[in-house]
Design a protein with these regions (language model features):
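A short glycine-rich, His/Asp/Glu-containing loop-to-beta-strand
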Residues: 2-31, 75
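Short acidic-glycine-tyrosine-enriched beta hairpin
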Residues: 60-87, 121-128
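Conserved short histidine dyad/triad with adjacent acidic residue
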Residues: 25-39, 73-74, 82-84
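Short loop/turn motifs at secondary-structure junctions and domain boundaries
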Residues: 17-19, 36-38, 62-63
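Short beta-strand His + acidic residue motifs that chelate non-heme Fe in jelly-roll/DSBH
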Residues: 36-38, 55-56, 81, 87-93
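Glycine- and acidic-residue-biased ligand/ion/polar-headgroup-sensing regions
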Residues: 41-58
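Double-stranded beta-helix
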Residues: 93-142
């Protein structure tokens, strides 16, 4: 049986597999949705199944985030992210994106994760209620921070 989780802002995650060492999700972002900067607390790999997704990549330096690049994925493309990666994911192209996300741990449970306020770039421990507030603010901004 697959668990299906829907977010307030329209994100949807379908759990394919979850264990202490590995999580596999199908993730759907609605058109125009942008996440706040966040990490996964472990390595992550995204395989884009449909749509177009821009990922803005950051590195932590001296307690701050520094933008280090952008990668735009289209159907069939893969983005591997090492544990230290911080990124913003953004749905482009006028239709939802759907991706297979694979993580090296239980990111829905025990793995400590972080997020950043998209307006101030202040770091916070990830909690889903605040994450949704940050995602709404990020989606209304003209671009990723």
């Amino acid at each position: 049986m697959l668990a299906y989780i829907s977010g307030v802002g329209g994100n949807a995650r379908q759990v394919f597999y979850r264990s202490p060492n590995l999580t596999m999700l199908k993730v759907c972002f609605p058109n125009g949705r942008r996440t706040p900067p966040h990490d996964h607390g472990t390595w992550a790999t995204i395989l884009l199944l449909s749509g177009e997704e821009k990922n803005t990549l950051y590195r932590r330096e001296n307690g701050r985030l520094r933008r280090v690049g952008e990668v735009t994925l289209t159907r069939g493309e893969i983005l591997p992210m090492p544990t230290e990666t911080v990124h913003v994911a953004e749905c482009l192209g006028g239709k939802p994106t759907i991706g297979l996300h694979v993580y090296g741990g239980d990111i829905m449970g025990e793995v400590p994760r972080h997020m950043w306020d998209p307006q101030t770039l202040a770091e916070h421990a990830l909690d889903w209620n605040t994450y949704e507030t940050f995602a709404q603010a990020a989606s209304q901004a003209p671009s990723a921070p």
